[in-house]
């Protein structure tokens, strides 16, 4: 019965997809992976237990994106404000990030996935930076899913960094003020200039937490009470179905669509 229900959900998704407007295509999926600590606490375990048990949800999400030809997946792994958490938890998270990258990079490469880590690397350890650079270098020529991991990232920080970069280029005469518009500005963003189509946040929290503020301008948003370690392909299918049920207007009226 479970298998039948899952295939029925996929059939419904296909029908919705085929009848959607051409501009309503899911190219960029972004996820705020939330609830690991509360999931662990409900099981009387330390917070790192939740983080470790969330890796399977990451695997399932990546697999879904590959199967459904989603072009880009951005996962919010560690925000700039997360440095305020207890030192032991931060250390455990960084160790887990290193180990997961080390273990998963060969398989990601074999599946033609491009790995990129976006954010400020100045506070990361040399060991972790080395692993990030190895993963990026190994997969940079791949042509499949673009997997981006946001680490020590924040949307406001991203916009400020882009502004500084533009100011420096104007100062040396490489760029004129008249050349600055939304398109040119977006090219300087660490988070990239590809708009997010669908944002998912788990755990029941309903906020952006300073994540990809520029790129989320016209994103559809799906909030679920499910904790990230329990997030599955079935819940992701529901989120995608919700996305394709939406009428994306981009400033136009409903009658113009």
UniProtKB/Swiss-Prot annotation:
Active site residues of this protein: 34, 82 (proton acceptor)
Gene Ontology BP term (one): peptidoglycan biosynthetic process
Annotated catalysed reactions: 8 isopentenyl diphosphate + (2E,6E)-farnesyl diphosphate = di-trans,octa-cis-undecaprenyl diphosphate + 8 diphosphate
Gene3D superfamilies the record matches: Decaprenyl diphosphate synthase-like (3.40.1180.10)
Binding note for cofactor: Binds 2 magnesium ions per subunit.
GO terms for cellular component: cytosol
Enzyme Commission designation: 2.5.1.31
A Pfam family this chain is assigned to: Prenyltransf
Molecular function per GO: ditrans,polycis-undecaprenyl-diphosphate synthase [(2E,6E)-farnesyl-diphosphate specific] activity; magnesium ion binding
Known cofactor(s): Mg(2+)
Top-level class of the enzyme under EC nomenclature: transferase
Alphabetic keyword roster: Cell shape, Cell wall biogenesis/degradation, Magnesium, Metal-binding, Peptidoglycan synthesis, Transferase
Covalent S-S links between cysteines: none
Residue numbers binding substrate: 35-39, 47, 51, 83, 85, 201, 207-209
InterPro entries referenced in this protein's UniProt entry, alphabetically: UPP_synth-like, UPP_synth-like_CS, UPP_synth-like_sf
Binding site for Mg(2+): 34, 220
NCBIfam families named in the record: uppS
Oligomeric form and interacting partners: Homodimer.
Protein family per UniProt: Belongs to the UPP synthase family.
Task performed by this protein: Catalyzes the sequential condensation of isopentenyl diphosphate (IPP) with (2E,6E)-farnesyl diphosphate (E,E-FPP) to yield (2Z,6Z,10Z,14Z,18Z,22Z,26Z,30Z,34E,38E)-undecaprenyl diphosphate (di-trans,octa-cis-UPP). UPP is the precursor of glycosyl carrier lipid in the biosynthesis of bacterial cell wall polysaccharide components such as peptidoglycan and lipopolysaccharide.
Identification of the protein by name: Ditrans,polycis-undecaprenyl-diphosphate synthase ((2E,6E)-farnesyl-diphosphate specific)
Organism field: Francisella tularensis subsp. tularensis (strain SCHU S4 / Schu 4)
Gene: uppS
